[in-house]
């Protein structure tokens, strides 16, 4: 028995043929599928081909059924390796997971970022997120005094 396929079109013109059941982990796509709006492909103007390929890889792995069994332990190991593999594009993955409404990928990517910055200094976190410190030295000291408990 053949599985229905749908075409996903990235913002930069790449097209990907994906099993509908795997793609429907994206709630955005699932709603379009329910409304029979998939015949001509689904344009995804907020997701590049590079990132869409990663999202599809994630969805294919997480589409577990009789033909594609996977234990929770194996899936957790795969998720960890997936995040390590795509660490340099993690913020793009977060944006795509949010846009496509893939809660499990969004949660995984956000937790990965949280784990990456926990126990780091403010300066390291600023550098990690490329945030410029716009406080004067005096303002920064005042904030530290007012919130001393947070720096202990």
Curated annotation (Swiss-Prot):
GO terms for cellular component: nucleus; SCF ubiquitin ligase complex. Keywords: Nucleus, Ubl conjugation pathway. Gene3D superfamilies: Potassium Channel Kv1.1, Chain A. It is found in: Nucleus. InterPro entries: SKP1, SKP1-like, SKP1-like_dim_sf, SKP1/BTB/POZ_sf, Skp1_comp_dimer, Skp1_comp_POZ. Expressed in young seedlings, roots, leaves, floral stems, inflorescences, and siliques. The keyword Nucleus applies. Pfam families: Skp1 (PF01466), Skp1_POZ (PF03931). Residues 94-152 are annotated as: Interaction with the F-box domain of F-box proteins. Part of a SCF (SKP1-cullin-F-box) protein ligase complex. Interacts with CPR1/CPR30. Involved in ubiquitination and subsequent proteasomal degradation of target proteins. Together with CUL1, RBX1 and a F-box protein, it forms a SCF E3 ubiquitin ligase complex. The functional specificity of this complex depends on the type of F-box protein. In the SCF complex, it serves as an adapter that links the F-box protein to CUL1. This is SKP1-like protein 10. The gene is ASK10.
